[in-house]
């Protein structure tokens, strides 16, 4: 008797991200971020850009893929200007998603080895600790410009956290023997533990402190 199409192909009982890590037990404690952190069971976190032209489409992109996309940006130096890292003309990961995928996968393996925890859960904790709740905007009134504290939308909170995690890792491995994967793993672990020495967490504290002084 001929096998059906379904029987011919292997179907795993549970899809694991990158074939290694389950998302079933991963929890998000922050209620505002919960709807925007996509934790679908997906073997390969790659959406082929299908959400790029949709309003708020990136909310449907898997959280691991969003980290990979941030890793593909130009790197940061160890120098700052106005509180921000200066960028370098480094194209080693720009537009190279498979290479960025391997970097993130290696970083997750380092996190799992050091913490004995699911690295996706550690990443979620790092995002929650690095996402600023308040920021400042410039208001013009009567020809005078001044700063005003505003609440940050959940989607932007997520963007800022992921961007600063990737930037902090890039700056940490600038001109030294530390690999990007190792630096990324250290940045995620430190941010998950709310370590003030890490760039992502310290930047969040700085943004909220400036916003509080602008109330």
Curated annotation (Swiss-Prot):
Gene Ontology CC terms, in alphabetical order: small ribosomal subunit
UniProt cross-references to InterPro entries, sorted A to Z: Ribosomal_uS7 (IPR000235), Ribosomal_uS7_arc (IPR026018), Ribosomal_uS7_dom (IPR023798), Ribosomal_uS7_dom_sf (IPR036823), Ribosomal_uS7_euk/arc (IPR005716)
GO BP field: translation
GO molecular function per UniProt: rRNA binding; structural constituent of ribosome
Domain of life per record: Archaea
Keywords, alphabetical: Ribonucleoprotein, Ribosomal protein, RNA-binding, rRNA-binding
Family designation: Belongs to the universal ribosomal protein uS7 family.
Annotated function: One of the primary rRNA binding proteins, it binds directly to 16S rRNA where it nucleates assembly of the head domain of the 30S subunit. Is located at the subunit interface close to the decoding center.
Subunit structure: Part of the 30S ribosomal subunit.
The protein's name: Small ribosomal subunit protein uS7
The encoding gene: rps7
